[in-house]
Every structure is written in structure tokens, then in C-alpha cells.
Amino acid sequence: MEVLMAERANLVFHNKVIDGTAMKRLISRLIDHFGMAYTSHILDQVKTLGFQQATATSISLGIDDLLTISSKGWLVQDAEQQSLLLEKHHRYGNVHAVEKLRQSIEIWYATSEYLRQEMNPNFRMTDPSNPVHIMSFSGARGNVSQVHQLVGMRGLMSDPQGQMIDLPIQSNLREGLSLTEYTISCYGARKGVVDTAVRTSDAGYLTRRLVEVVQHVVVRRTDCGTIRGISISIRNGMTGRILIQTLIGRVLADDVYMGLRCIAARNQDIGIGLVNRFITSRAQPIYIRTPFTCRSTSWICRLCYGRSPTHGDLVELGEAVGIIAGQSIGEPGTQLTLRTFHTGGVFTGGTAEHVRAPFNGKIKFNEDLVHPTRTRHGHPAFLCYIDLYVTIESQDILHNVNIPPKSFILVQNDQYVESEQVIAEIRARTSTFSFKEKVRKHIYSDSEGEIHWSTDVYHVPEYTHGNVHLLPKTTHLWILSGGPGPCRRSIVPFSLHKDQDQMNLQSLSVEQRYISNLSVNNDRVRHKLFDLDPFWKKKGGVGYSGPDRILSNGHWDFIYPAILHENSNLLAKRRRNRFIISFQHDQEREKKLPPRSGIKIEIPINGILRRNSILAYFDDPRYRRSSSGITKYGTIEVDSIVKKDDLIEYRGAKELRPKYQMKVDPFFFIPEEVHILPGSSPIMVRNNSIIGVDTRITLNTRSRIGGLVRVERKKKRIELKIFSGDIHFPGETDKISRHSGILIPPETRKKNSKESKSKQLKNWIYVQRITPIKKKYFVSVRAVVIYEIADGIHLATLFPQDLLQERDNLQLRVVNYFLYGNGKPIRGISHKSIQLVRTCLVLNWDQDQNGSIEEVYASFVKVRANDLIRDFIRIDLVKSPISKRNDTAGSGLIPVNGSDRTNINPFCSKARIQSLSQHQGTVRTFLNRNKEGESFLVLSSSNCSRIGPFNGLKYHNLTKKESIQIKEDPMIPIRNSLGPFGTVPKIANFYSSYQLITHNEILLNKYLLLDNPKQTFEALKYYFMDENGIIYNPDPCSNIILNPFDSNWYFPHQDYCEETCTIISLGQFICENVCISKHGPRIKSGQVLIVHVDSLVIRSAKPHLATPGATVHGHYGEILYEGNTLVTFIYEKSRSGDITQGLPKVEQVLEVRSIDSISMNLEKRFEGWGERMTGILGIPWGFLIGAELTIAQSHFSLVNKIQRVYRSQGVQIHNRHIEIIVRQITSKVLVSEDGMSNVFSPGELIGLLRAERTGRALEEAICYRAVLLGITRASLNTQSFISEASFQETTRVLAKAALRGRIDWLKGLKENVVLGGMIPVGTGFKGLVHHSREHNNIPFEIQKKSRFEGEMRDILFPHRELFCSCLETNFHDTSEQSFMGLNDS
């Protein structure tokens, strides 16, 4: 004490806060200066002093001391504003769900972090002696993060799965939480409690395994004699702190020279003074000894270990450094799991650096070196692949910035930037060892409707036949509003017959039904227009012509409108290369004959028919059914597998020789009654029960047939089937197929059967096995309806004879098609018949004379003569009359004769220009249904449109050879004569007036805001246009019912066409907030359905942005229910840096799990190094040195990876502890060839050095390869079976050891503890060690020579090589087989 008092006068008073790190430094310096005993005396004084001061201070914590930071209000408000803006962008379809989540989390995380940083200065300025402030930085209780939750904001929490909840808790614990915030907080708090329990046990288990691996590693010798070392270069940009941490306490493996002068000798331990000399002198690469370089097998020497971390001298002999290493790595995990108040992982791939403009100016860079992209927040940016030089110039200053590769440029070229504006974002450096994981995020539909998208999609490879599509580029997915049929509460009663059929008002069947499954291949739709049957007219049905949609079955690629003429005759005339087919309507004949199926003529909208396309089809009433069922067709054969019962089974469309011969190919229809009910409706019958005819199934449905009831519950609906027929309980000897049903032909019976002949089958039957739950199975036997398709259909009865003659290059042939797939269930709706087979007329033409023609042009022609209207089909064998040309100046019709374009709108730049040549237009007149004789100008070519008014353009008529001049009349607005936007589109099937679904004029008046109800039919002149600019009539009667009462319609009633800002085409999707006119309303998002002169009707839709790589669940046009999965995003997310989350990472690295990236990287490196070194040095040497380098590389990567996890939490663990663990993981090799049958067996794990020494002793090469063991496997593969048995799998280990006759030499600690022997560690250990021969007495020359020989031996035959041999042995004597085995392994 006197000495301390005497020296105190000379010391400077040091007024500084001492935290844990500073205390460590102080204690280590005290030990260096005064020794251990004196230091402990001083620390006792410091402890006493601390307790005295704390008692005198008497800090107590009250609720008034929790002061909320003043700037919190506007910070939270600002974050809320950003979140609202983000939500708006998401609604507009500008950012997708993952970008929104990511940005939202970063906004709130940044706000929370800023508040946390503000907390300390705020306390320091307002209340420096605040107990909360003093205690939060004392390290005694609580930390900044917890105090921040008391006075800042609670922030973001994790859900039970560890994912972030993007709704932050804005309150702090002082203000109190709202109910929602409390619920969210409970998630995180509960997760914290559970994590603490689970992860604490994990950490304990990790420590146990670590200690188990290295418990036998003890310092047993002073020097192992190795001359190997790891080089550390000072020039490679290491920071001083990391260099000092790496070097201090190590031992040099070689002399260090500065020029010719030796500044440090081999085997000298490195202190702080020596490190400073190395740094100042910029010495050559320094070689140090590490546990990796030690020559020993199961122990370590003093010089390879270095200084002891406890007292700073070389480690003592007998010190159990293995156990210290295991506990050093395991202990931080155990301690740090108690940090329950973690904020969880944040969605950052490392915080990105921002480059800011130093002053105001204009920015310039080379646009060719960048390409546009999206940032991870969905903002537009440019990505540069190589170094980009950016120049910022103001009036008199030039500033150059070099942007590194893979960075985002956030401004445009030649843009004016302000000072401190962010101009670029540099990607955070992500090494191969950063912990990232791929996360799938499913986006669910929050509304129901029809799904559309605006790009091509690919099928995901594993779902080629499913409905999962992969997006190749960024697109919008649209959910078009409208419920699935009348299961919605609608005021107007509708009937839903088959898929996408006509909706008839006041129809006979107004039952509520669901739509049956859509079976569509190419996701396109074709239309046909039809006149209603006289039957409907007599019954008082609505008599207007309505459109009808039928799904195509994969043979067509266009949207077809077709015209159906009931009971009409076809008259065909031909002139040269044209077909003209006239339609005659025979009124008299219609009265006499019952209505029969007519021939439907199909012509695509654009009028182009390709080779082998279907021109017309005929539905034969013989193949028509009114009930649901299943069709089966294909070759019939006797099943050869079930010989016992001789059953006939359907064999698909395989080309097999049928044993059961038939004259014509039959197909079978198995009828069944099907009811599709809503999921919530009560069912009054049980599954697998038997009911009679007219049994009540639900409250308002009765069965039409009797039989077996089968109920299948699907998502949101119930499918109820009734099978008519017999039930048969088979005996034990009967074998019934477990798979699909079996068709049995008539006149077959069981062999050796004692049944009478009357029980033999007279008709085909369909046998199906049914297995109820917990009951014996039984068999349903149903009758089958057989249809035979005769070859000799009299074509003359269907089509006029002269139509079928092959003449004038055009051919028509008749083909039969099945409309339903084999074995596919057919869902029929009541009062609607199902067509099974369709007879089609296929169009073809001779290729010889018109070799280049791949498509013909078909059109309907109306000829009016003597007040009689005749319809003709004309087929022209000419090429498509459209030629396309791109022009960046504007959009307009460009006549080929070169007249000037006029009035081109400036906003139409870079649009597609479509030119019309002089003789390729056709003028036709269309008569309206009300025979008012209005005529329209129609161009007979698709995709022909013009924007803006235009003057005097000529269109030539092919038929009349005269040109029609259109002149602009100043009295008539141009848009009235030329369509809504001054376009001249093709108009197909135009009606002068059309109604919405309802006939109620008052309702229309209410919704369309018309002044006079009488003007309704005159006012509603609707156009309907697809994306090609073709206008046809609107089709409100699709499978989605657009009901005005469900607010699916939106009418912006404004004269917006005066100053149109954007081009509107019908069928176009418009995002919300897009301005379509200067003074017009901001419209909702949706699809333009109907365009009127001064208003348009939009079907509301919801956009979802999807980026490339996302998968869409569903077909184009499919109905999506609320809650269905819409799209799945896959994105990379940095795993949380929290230690409780970090522990599994450490464990994965130490266990060398295959799920982690490390083993993959290391395996690639093994191969890479081997190939490179083999290429340089030849086969044997290259392979050996390559293996040596690979193992060294794996050492470094494992150490760095584990260190990174702990350093991220501010935990410092010395490298040598981790090195000892990693050394044990990599110390085993796998014998790969039976080269030494007497010693090792193939596949055996042996120590590396043991294999080397055995090879040297026997002078024979051993073939083996390096393996990475996990800590658990390493624990179970030690030299001591007692140690292994006390770890885990005790019975197995002891049994194996007994069978092999293993001997335990009791070298480690654990086996001695188990058996109660003396532990071979500690200070008394020195007496037990027999000193090996000392190297110190060898003369210097011999020592140098032996060192040189050792170096050569280490280079050529390092102790971790794959072949062990000696220098004395001639290398070429080694058998070639060993090398062959090496290559194979």
C-alpha cells in the first residue's frame, strides 16, 4: 500500500468512463507491469471504491425518469408518410409485395435506429444525471437497446416463425401499447422466451460437443520441430487492429529480415513491440506457427500454440488448451442467448453506401455502359457492370466520381442534381461466406375474379401440365372483378348453363350453380354469335342477339367470332381463287320441320384462315347427351394381367392389337348425375349411401336418378355424384383393380363359374371399386352407353355436294373430333345438352400453284338486292394485306404513294406504324339489326388505326374499283364519323345500340347519368376494341357476371376526348391514378370495357406487379377465389445477425452441414485446386500440392466464417481457439483404395499423420482423400472408445469396440475421469513426460542442412498429402494402379 501511495503523486488524474473493454486492457497492462498478485490487490481496491461510490450515489429509478425523446413525433410522422406513399405505389402496381415489405421494414428500422442514436445526446443535453441514462451505459443492468424500448419506440418485432412483422410498434413502454401493438409485442416476447429456453439448451449442447472433440488436446512438448508456417503479409491492406490481434501471442516459424538484417529469429514469440517494428519496417511476409502446423497427432506443442491468453507468457506444459478452446467458443453462445429483446433480422444485404453530389450541377456519364433496372425497393435505376466515371459539372468546377461495378445509378444522364443528393448506391460487399437464405413469399388474392397477365409465360419445368407459370419479365397480374356466377347475391336472376355460355334473362333454369372446372390448353377464347331458337321466342325469352363464348380446346390460337345460322342451306359458287358461299333462309321450311342442328361457320376476327383450320362444323344430334358422365374411347383389348377373371380393361391410346375385334371404333359414355354445390350448403344424404329417385339432396335440389351417392369436398365447393346401377360385394377370390374403372364386354363370365347362364352379361358394363373408410370395399356396376362412329357418314346430307369437290386449288374435308378427353368427367347442367362428337369441315388448298401462301383471307359479304339481304363468305387466296413499318417520329397512316402525314400527335412517338398499300383496302357496308341502313367504313386489314384527326386520305375498293374520298366536315366532329378517337378501325358485327345486362332504363339512367331516359338507346353507342385496335360489339355476358349493383362498373362521365392525354384502346388495362385527360377525373384501375362518345365504362380490376422469376398460380382467364395463392416470389434475405440466430450458423459450420454453402464451396475448391496444380506440375505432384493447398484453404475459410458470426455481436474470440477445433475437424482422412489390406480397410477414417507415418514405415503409398468431419462425427471417431461411449450412442459404440477388440490407451482427460484415474494435465504433468531427444545440441551446420532437407520433404511430401512415401523410395516405382484409384476417387 505504501508503494502505491508513494507513486500516486506522480500519476495524472484520468477522468474517463471505463467500460468492459477498457477494464480488460487495464488489467492486462497491470499484469504486465506488476504481476498477478499485485494486480489482484489493486482490483480489490477498485471494487471497494466502486461499492462505496454506488452507495453514496444511491441511484433509484422512477417512472418520471423515463423521458421520451422530443424528436420522436415528427420522425414517426415522417415514416408514416413514407409508408402511406409506399402503400399507394403498391396499389398503383408500381412495386410488388416483396419490395413493399422490404422497404417498409427498412423505413421503420431506420427510424428506430435514428431514435436510438438520438437518445444519448438527448439525455446528455437535457438531463445528464438521469438514472436511466447513467444505468443504460454502465453495463451493470440493461443495454441501449432495452432502454430504447422504454423511451424511444419498441420498433419491429418477429413473428413466431422468426419473420419480420412489417407493422411496427410505434409506442414505447413508457407511453403504453395499444391493443394491436400489445398483440404484436406478445409474439416477439413469447418468441424471445421460447428462444431463450431452446437456444440456451442448444448452446449448452454445442459447448458439450466442442469440448468432446478437443478434450484430449493438451500441451505435451515444447517444440514439435515443424518448419511449416502460415504467411501473413502486411501489404495486403490489413488494418492495424486486425494485424495486431493476429500476430500478438504467436511464435515465428522463420526468421524475419529487413533487407539483409534479421530483425526477429525463428521460434521467437511476438509482442507488441515486435509487431510495431514489423508495421513500421513493412517487413516481408511473416511466417507464424499455428495449431494447424503442429506435427503432433493428438497433442500440441508450446511453440505452435503460442502465448497463453491468461498471463501472457508461453503456454505451460500440461495445460488443457483443448477444453479451454471448446469453452471459449461455446460460452458466448450460452451467455448471449439471454438477449431476449432482439429486434430480429432486418432486410438488408449489408447497408449500401450512398454516393452524394458534392455541389449543385449537371451530371454526365456514358449511357452505353449502363442499362435500366429496378432497385430492391422497386425504384427505377441504372446498373453499371464495369467501373463508371461520373462527371458533375457546375459553372466553374468539375468533379469526377468513380462508381464501382454492380452499383445503381439513381439519376439520369444530363440531369441537374442538388448538393448532397444521392446519385448512386454502391452494393454492399457480400463475400461468399455471408449468410443469405432464399425465402419464398406467397401473395394471396384479396379479391375474387378473373386472372389476366400481359406477357408470355413459361411453364415451370416440374409443372408442365399444371397451372404454375414462370414469368420471364416484369409484368402486371390483373384480377378482374366479378364473382364466379350467380353464387354472388345478385338482384337480377341469371342462369348459368355450361362454361361461358349465354346468360338469358327470365330463363327457365334459375338454379344457383357453380362453374365447372375449366379445361383449357392455350388459354384463348373464341366467340360465336347466334340467333336464338324459335323455341325461346315462343317461351317469352329475350329475343335480342347476344354473344356466346365457348372455350377452345387447344386447336385454335385466335379469338373467333362465328356466325350461326339455324336451318340454313349452303350454296357455294366459285370464281377463280375465291369461294363465295351464300346462306338462304327458308321461312316456309322452318315452319314444317322441327328445329335441327345447323352448320356453324367459323371465321376469325382478323379474317385470316391458316392451312388446316376449321371453316365450319356440324354437331350431330346422335352424339348429344343431356346428363353428366365420363367418356372412354381408344383401342379395346382383353387385359392380359388378370387372367383369372378375364376382365377387359381400357388401355389408353396405345397401338396394340385388339383381342376384342370390332367393325368400327366405339366409344363409351358412362352416365352419372353430378351436383356442384357451394361449400356451405347442407347436404341431406351421406357419402356411400344408396338413394332412390327424386330423393331430396339439399333444401331445393332433388335427385333425378337413384343409386350410390359419392360426396367429394373441394375448396369452397362440394361435388356430389350419383351412380346408377348395381352394388356388388365381391368374394375373397375376386381381384378387382384398385385403379380406375374397368369396362367389361358382354357375353363374358368367370371361368369355372357355377352361375347360371342367365346371369351372363348382355351389355357392356363399367365396374368401379369403392373403398369406404374403415369398411370393406364394394364394387359399383353401371350400365354403359355405346356410340359407334361410322366411317360412311353421308357428307352430302351435311354439306352441299359442290362444296366438297376438290377444285380450284381449294379442298374441304370432313373430320370427326372428340370434344372431351378420354376419361375426363363431363359436367352437364340441367336443360342443356352436351355434344360429345363434332364433325368439322377442314379447309386446305393446293400448295403447288400457290406455294408461298400460308394463309387465306376470309370475309363475310352482305349483298342487298331488291330489299333481300344475302350473306356470302368470300375466301381470297391472297397474302395478308398488312405491312408494318416502325417510325420514331409519330403514329399515323402512311400511304404508300408518299403523301405527307398531317396532324401527328406529339405524344405518340416510338409507336408502331402500320401502312396500307394502295390496292389492299376493301370497303364493305354493314347493315344494323334495326335495318336503318347506316353504313360504316371498314378496312379489310387488321391492326390498322390512326390517332388524331387527319385530312383527305384515299381508300380504294377492290370490288367496285372506285375510290372514296373522306373529307373533314367542319360541322361534324371527326370522332363521330371515325370512331371514338378519330380512328378508322375494323368494325365487326356492329350494333347501333346495345344494352347492359339489365333492361331497366331507370337503372341505366341512374348509373350512366343520362338526362333523358328516352335517349337511352340512342346515347349508348358502344364500341368494344381488343388490343389490336379492332372494334367489335361489347360482350358483357361472359362467364363472369358484371353486375352494376356490385360496383364492378365505373363510369367517368366526362367529355375527356377533347384533350386526350393518353391513347385509350378497348380492352386496355389502366392503372389507378393515370391521367387520361387534362381536366378529367382520376380513374380507378381496371380494364376499358366500353367506349362511348363522351364517356367510357371500366371494369374494375386490381393490379399486382410481378418481377421475373416469380411463379403465377393459375391459368390466363381462370377464376381466382379470395384467399387463393396468386403469385410466389423468391428473394434473397440476409439472415439475422442476432447471436441467438447466429448460434445455428456456428453449429452448421462446425458440423459441416451440406445445407450450408461452406461444404459446397470447399468441394468446388478441392476440385479447382487439384485441376490447376495438375495442369502446372503434372499428375502426381500437382495432385499432392493441390490437396495440401485445399486443406489449408478450408482451414482459413472455416475460421473466418466462425469469427464473422461472433464479431458481428462484438464478441472477441482468439483465432487459436477456433483453430484447435477446426484442426480436429480436418484431421481425419478416408482410405479410398485397398492398397494396404494388412493395415487399413477402404472407407476407414484414420488420422492424417498416422496414415503418413504408417506409409513411411511400410515404404508403401497409401491412397486416401481428405474429408471434413462435423464435430459430432469427430467426437465419435476418436482413438478412445470410452470417450465416444460417454458422449452418445453408448450401446452401439461399446458393441463395435468389443467386436473389433479395440484398445483404449487412456490418453485423454475424459476416459481417465470415467475410470477414476489421474488426469494427464496440469502442473504435475511434467514428471510424467519423458523428454524426447533435444535438438539444441546439434551443430549449426547440420541443423541448417536438416532444415533444408525438411523443407524439401515438406514441399514434395507434406504431411497431409494423399500419398505417403519417402524421398529414399524411387517415386516412379509406385504402381500406376494407385494413381488410377486416386483419379477414380
UniProtKB/Swiss-Prot annotation:
Q: How is the cofactor bound?
A: Binds 1 Zn(2+) ion per subunit.
Residue sites binding Zn(2+) per the record: C224, C294, C301, C304
- Cysteines paired by S-S bonds: none
Recorded hits in Gene3D superfamilies, A to Z, give: 1.10.132.30, 1.10.150.390, 1.10.1790.20, RNA polymerase Rpb1, domain 3 (1.10.274.100)
Q: Which GO terms describe its cellular component?
A: chloroplast; DNA-directed RNA polymerase complex; mitochondrion
User: So what does this thing catalyse?
Assistant: RNA(n) + a ribonucleoside 5'-triphosphate = RNA(n+1) + diphosphate
Q: Which cellular compartments is it found in?
A: Plastid, Chloroplast
* E.C. code: 2.7.7.6
Q: Which InterPro entries match?
A: DNA-dir_RpoC2_beta_pp (IPR012756), RNA_pol_beta''_euk (IPR050254), RNA_pol_Rpb1_3_sf (IPR042102), RNA_pol_Rpb1_4 (IPR007083), RNA_pol_Rpb1_5 (IPR007081), Rpb1_funnel_sf (IPR038120)
Q: Recall the GO molecular function terms of this protein's record.
A: DNA binding; DNA-directed RNA polymerase activity; zinc ion binding
- Cofactor or coenzyme needed: Zn(2+)
Q: Name one GO biological process term.
A: DNA-templated transcription
**Keyword field:** Chloroplast, DNA-directed RNA polymerase, Metal-binding, Nucleotidyltransferase, Plastid, Transcription, Transferase, Zinc
User: HAMAP family annotated for this entry?
Assistant: RNApol_bact_RpoC2
Function of this protein?
DNA-dependent RNA polymerase catalyzes the transcription of DNA into RNA using the four ribonucleoside triphosphates as substrates.
Alphabetized NCBIfam families for the sequence: rpoC2_cyan (TIGR02388)
Family membership: Belongs to the RNA polymerase beta' chain family. RpoC2 subfamily.
Q: How does it assemble?
A: In plastids the minimal PEP RNA polymerase catalytic core is composed of four subunits: alpha, beta, beta', and beta''. When a (nuclear-encoded) sigma factor is associated with the core the holoenzyme is formed, which can initiate transcription.
| UniProt-recorded name of the protein | DNA-directed RNA polymerase subunit beta''
Could you tell me which species this protein originates from? Illicium oligandrum (Star anise)
What gene is behind this protein? rpoC2
